[in-house]
Amino acid sequence: MAASIGALKSSPSSHNCINERRNDSTRAISSRNLSFSSSHLAGDKLMPVSSLRSQGVRFNVRRSPLIVSPKAVSDSQNSQTCLDPDASRSVLGIILGGGAGTRLYPLTKKRAKPAVPLGANYRLIDIPVSNCLNSNISKIYVLTQFNSASLNRHLSRAYASNMGEYKNEGFVEVLAAQQSPENPDWFQGTADAVRQYLWLFEEHNVLEYLILAGDHLYRMDYEKFIQAHRETDADITVAALPMDEKRATAFGLMKIDEEGRIIEFAEKPQGEQLQAMKVDTTILGLDDKRAKEMPFIASMGIYVISKDVMLNLLRDKFPGANDFGSEVIPGATSLGMRVQAYLYDGYWEDIGTIEAFYNANLGITKKPVPDFSFYDRSAPIYTQPRYLPPSKMLDADVTDSVIGEGCVIKNCKIHHSVVGLRSCISEGAIIEDSLLMGADYYETDAERKLLAAKGSVPIGIGKNCLYKRAIIDKNARIGDNVKIINKDNVQEAARETDGYFIKSGIVTVIKDALIPSGIVI
């Protein structure tokens, strides 16, 4: 991991970058220069603040609004990052760990939502943290409230402060909800969670706060996002996803003017209200064909907020607001603040339900191109180094699947499935369209023999099992001849005492559950 973090490098600078000197109309910003790594951007750069101050430039007046260029507000794959490394490091990343994760239960029974395993080797929290590190944002807080022990352990092992070249100033730190004389309640929502730690966030010498969710699957260059925020002189910039009419009814939609400024919000609109939220998405960079297919934009719950604006909104303007999306952001618009939309036109999935989690994981097995790839060397996804041996497959038939590290797979068939760390799968098993999360530890041969002698079941998948459309959480002990096929096509069922739940027709075996031999689910 140390080598991986040390290999982080800045994206090449575009020839079209604006080597702009902030004039008298630029708001106050800090002159402290930060360092993260020895890598640097080639070509034109934004002028460091210290250089401007030495030339007598003042920073106490707001700049007049700018006309928005589509290139400045979209995450086009043709555009290139042109922020100076110091500029992106003047941003504090704040990742919201989410609520209790009731819709993801039982996966959240013993862990916070961002700690849920993903893609055989990773956890959900690795996505926003890796996006930050790949964007040269090295100061990151993760706010949690429920079951944060495993999340804290993972982050401390994966992103230790003495690793890589960001050791001098970078960190990834968990902030759990706490009670104090000023705030006797737990987090009441996204905005309230940030408000309760404003005293800590404002100590950091940064220009903006980057607010992220801990349960989304996507790959995004935040440097472009931040650059768009600064070039448009926005108070708040909201990441927006283009939507067709079919999906739009499930999201909070936004309406923009010809400059890309947000002027209206609507939460899951229907009928005439939905039609009224149509926008010309060519303003944000889509071509004419895509704009006709995607005439709506939905908030991704990702924001860049200028530091002074955040302090003003949460402390003074809306001291009782609990949520960013439904209260603070619309409130800022009503106050006349400049709230800009930034188009992200790529794969994005909100991992909020069992079905979404299942589909997102199996999506990485899709041919010829997966929904989300962990193989992008220009923007890798980091995780905890475990130093496990390669997976061993003995007479196994494995197709269209992803296999994690340290697995032992014997004479079985696996198709269109994801198999997690340290999975042990015995002879004769057939696994289709399923997600196995693996195990936290190995049992020795002696321990497995002793369990078998006592009539108990070792960790892993027993002989001659059949799984279809199932999720098996970590450390599950499943005996021989077990069938998990949802034979009665049940859509919803809670069988916690029996070790499993069914949601959206997907059978989910609970972590540490014991399923005796011969059981049919």
Swiss-Prot record:
UniProt keywords, alphabetically: Allosteric enzyme, ATP-binding, Chloroplast, Nucleotide-binding, Nucleotidyltransferase, Plastid, Starch biosynthesis, Transferase, Transit peptide
GO biological process per UniProt: glycogen biosynthetic process; starch biosynthetic process
Cell compartments where the protein resides: Plastid, Chloroplast
Pathway noted in the entry: Glycan biosynthesis; starch biosynthesis
Stretches that traverse the bilayer: none
Major enzyme class: transferase
GO cellular component, one term: chloroplast
Transit peptide extent on chain: 1-72
Disordered: annotated segments: 1-24
Keyword Cell membrane: no
CDD domains the record matches: ADP_Glucose_PP (cd02508), LbH_G1P_AT_C (cd04651)
SUPFAM superfamilies given in the database record: Nucleotide-diphospho-sugar transferases, Trimeric LpxA-like enzymes
Catalytically driven reaction(s): alpha-D-glucose 1-phosphate + ATP + H(+) = ADP-alpha-D-glucose + diphosphate
Activity regulation (UniProt): Activated by 3'phosphoglycerate, inhibited by orthophosphate. Allosteric regulation.
Origin superkingdom: Eukaryota
Protein family per UniProt: Belongs to the bacterial/plant glucose-1-phosphate adenylyltransferase family.
Job of this protein: This protein plays a role in synthesis of starch. It catalyzes the synthesis of the activated glycosyl donor, ADP-glucose from Glc-1-P and ATP.
Oligomeric and partner information: Heterotetramer.
The protein's name: Glucose-1-phosphate adenylyltransferase small subunit, chloroplastic
Gene source species: Solanum lycopersicum
Species lineage: Eukaryota, Viridiplantae, Streptophyta, Embryophyta, Tracheophyta
